[in-house]
């Protein structure tokens, strides 16, 4: 075990040697653990980190994410923001997507929307990028027209769309995001978000999860 840990520390040293780190204070830690996500979360909690960055690989669509189980555990349970990165250029004046959920009136969803937008805007200042709001909303239940013959699916869909438009517009006004940077589409989030990411050629997607955090969430 000690030999493997020493080998990993040497690998980190070799990796850092490729970069100019003279002006940075870098602490290196190699931990032996059979559940990597727990070791990472313990480190975050111990040092009160505000951002966790991890490499990953992503296919052209969110439907075929190549995230590992560790990635998913960290997204759901890490007590800080998680940045999953892949090989991608970071151009000036790029696009950042803030994926929000405008269909819920619940306070915890509203707070999460605001945190997502705040993180996106903070990153936009660092990267000299523009922020776009993206939201996916569901279609009318398929069986409802059968169970309730007088139910007007078109009227329901139009009203639902307008509700999401109004809620997104309110977020746009609150955070100074113009109408042309507000995007809404009917469908599943895992379909809608990557479609807009491709359409906008986005460099970064900011999204959130509702759930417990920390080791107790495992």
Language-model features and meaning:
Residues 1-6, 95-151, 158, 174-177:
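Small/aliphatic-rich secondary-structure junction motif
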Residues 2, 17-52, 173-205, 212-215:
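Structural beta-alpha unit
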Residues 4-15, 119, 159-167, 192:
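Short, solvent-exposed amphipathic alpha-helices that sit
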Residues 72, 118-121, 169:
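Active-site phosphate/pyrophosphate- and oxyanion-stabilizing loops and adjacent acidic/basic residues
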Residues 41-92, 195-218:
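Gly/Ser-rich helix-loop-strand patches that form or flank binding pockets
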Residues 53, 83, 97, 132-134, ...:
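Hydrophobic/aromatic beta-strand patches that form the interior of the parallel beta-sheet core
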């Amino acid at each position: 075990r000690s030999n493997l840990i020493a080998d990993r520390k040497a690998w980190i040293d070799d990796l850092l040697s490729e970069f100019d780190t003279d002006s940075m204070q870098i602490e290196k830690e190699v931990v032996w653990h059979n559940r990597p996500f727990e070791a990472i979360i313990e480190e975050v909690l111990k040092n009160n980190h505000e951002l966790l960055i991890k490499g990953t690989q992503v296919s052209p669509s969110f439907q075929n994410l190549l995230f590992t189980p560790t990635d998913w555990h960290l997204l759901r349970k890490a007590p800080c923001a998680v940045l999953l990165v892949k090989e991608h250029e970071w151009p000036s004046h790029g696009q950042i997507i803030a994926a929000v959920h405008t269909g819920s009136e619940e306070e915890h969803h509203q707070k999460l929307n605001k945190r997502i937008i705040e993180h996106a805007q903070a990153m936009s200042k660092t990267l000299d990028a523009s922020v776009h709001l993206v939201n996916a909303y569901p279609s009318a239940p398929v069986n409802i027209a059968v169970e309730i013959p007088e139910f007007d699916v078109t009227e329901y869909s139009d009203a639902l769309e307008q509700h999401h438009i109004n809620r997104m517009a309110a977020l746009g006004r609150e955070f100074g995001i113009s109408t042309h940077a507000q995007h809404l589409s009917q469908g599943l989030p895992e379909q809608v978000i990557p479609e807009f990411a491709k359409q906008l050629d986005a460099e970064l997607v900011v999204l959130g999860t509702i759930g417990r955090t920390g080791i107790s969430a495992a």
